[in-house]
């Protein structure tokens, strides 16, 4: 990944991970990569990876099952126009 120096890394990784939830790469109910797997994929610290997972949960894009992991949340249906 090419890093933008003026944007915090957690925000850049969050943007990638949230896009994967929205575009269905991680379908609803699928377990997201662990903090360690995110560290390995993006070359970031575990603290940064945990921040990304926390932000995904706070945004409603993921939920945690204690002792199991973090999972992609079902996305709201788009209103019919």
Where are these regions (language model features)?
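Extreme N-terminal segment that seeds HTH/winged-HTH DNA-binding domains in transcriptional regulators
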Residues: 1-54, 58-63, 68, 74-81
């Amino acid at each position: 990944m090419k890093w933008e120096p003026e944007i915090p890394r957690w925000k850049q990784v969050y943007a990638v991970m949230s896009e994967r939830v929205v575009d269905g790469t991680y379908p609803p109910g699928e377990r997201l990569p662990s903090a360690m797997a995110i560290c390995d994929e993006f070359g970031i610290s575990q603290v940064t990876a945990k921040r990304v997972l926390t932000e995904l949960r706070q945004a409603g894009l993921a939920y945690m099952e204690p002792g199991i992991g973090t999972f992609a949340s079902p996305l709201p249906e788009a209103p019919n126009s």
